[in-house]
């Protein structure tokens, strides 16, 4: 939209990390482009690209973090909360091991926000990420709560976030395990009401399995009897 020249390299169009090292790919692309956005799996890949490219490298998504989504989420929360971010509280409920929960935890800590994670303890962010976030929050005045009680997590918040329970590339067999673990962490009207805030708002990075209008949504309904998964 801004008139830039953009090239999209889909996975099958690049030999990065396969027939060509990440370092070599970074050096070549860095000579051809003014910036690189990487959207893939390993955090170590985008960090190595940034180390050798010689141009700005943007993390469009990895398994561990989703910083560009955080820019959008921070802007959205600022626009719709009616108060400064350091006076805003939000919760993330669901599978908290991956990029969205990790990134929201770090984002909230850096911005001095009140951050709650509601998830089974086995699905919490790694101890390393939690420790880093707590250290940052001590400097910014942020608050961090990790709990296995979804209603405790959402009490008094301005926003409730969630994400899919089974990520792209995971086998269908993962659904049964996640549903068993996370059925009490679905974002439902009742959970929204449990916040005690009539103005609470729901956020999801999308796509969301919230009804039967997709092939996956219909399969989940036929297999598990759920009309919507992480959110209804």
Swiss-Prot record:
Keywords: Amino-acid biosynthesis, Arginine biosynthesis, Cytoplasm, Transferase
Binding site for carbamoyl phosphate: 15, 39, 66-69, 204-207, 232
Keyword Hydrolase found: no
Enzyme class label: transferase
Site (Important for structural integrity): 79
Protein family according to the UniProt entry: Belongs to the aspartate/ornithine carbamoyltransferase superfamily. OTCase family.
Record protein name field: Ornithine carbamoyltransferase
The organism of origin for this protein: Neisseria sicca
Organismal lineage: Bacteria, Pseudomonadati, Pseudomonadota, Betaproteobacteria, Neisseriales
């Amino acid at each position: 939209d801004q008139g830039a020249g953009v090239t999209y390299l889909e996975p099958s169009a690049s030999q990065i990390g396969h027939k060509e090292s990440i370092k070599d790919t970074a050096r070549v692309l860095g000579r051809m482009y003014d910036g690189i956005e990487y959207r893939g799996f390993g955090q170590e890949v985008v960090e190595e690209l940034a180390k050798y490219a010689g141009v700005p490298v943007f993390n469009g998504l990895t398994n561990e973090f989703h910083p560009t989504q955080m820019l959008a989420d921070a802007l959205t929360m600022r626009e719709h909360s009616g108060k400064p971010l350091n006076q805003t509280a939000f919760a993330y409920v669901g599978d908290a091991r991956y990029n969205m929960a990790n990134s929201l935890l770090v984002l909230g800590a850096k911005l001095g926000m009140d951050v709650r994670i509601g998830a089974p303890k086995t699905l919490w962010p790694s101890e390393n990420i939690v420790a880093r976030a707590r250290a940052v929050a001590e400097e910014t005045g942020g608050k961090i709560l990790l709990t296995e009680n979804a209603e405790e997590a959402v009490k008094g918040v301005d926003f409730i976030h969630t994400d899919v329970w089974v990520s792209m590339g995971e086998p269908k067999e993962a659904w049964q395990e996640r549903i068993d673990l996370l059925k009490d962490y679905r974002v439902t009207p009742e959970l929204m009401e449990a916040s005690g805030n009539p103005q609470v708002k729901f956020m999801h990075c999308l796509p969301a399995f919230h009804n039967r209008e997709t092939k996956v949504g219909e399969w989940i309904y036929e297999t598990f009897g759920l009309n919507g998964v992480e959110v209804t």
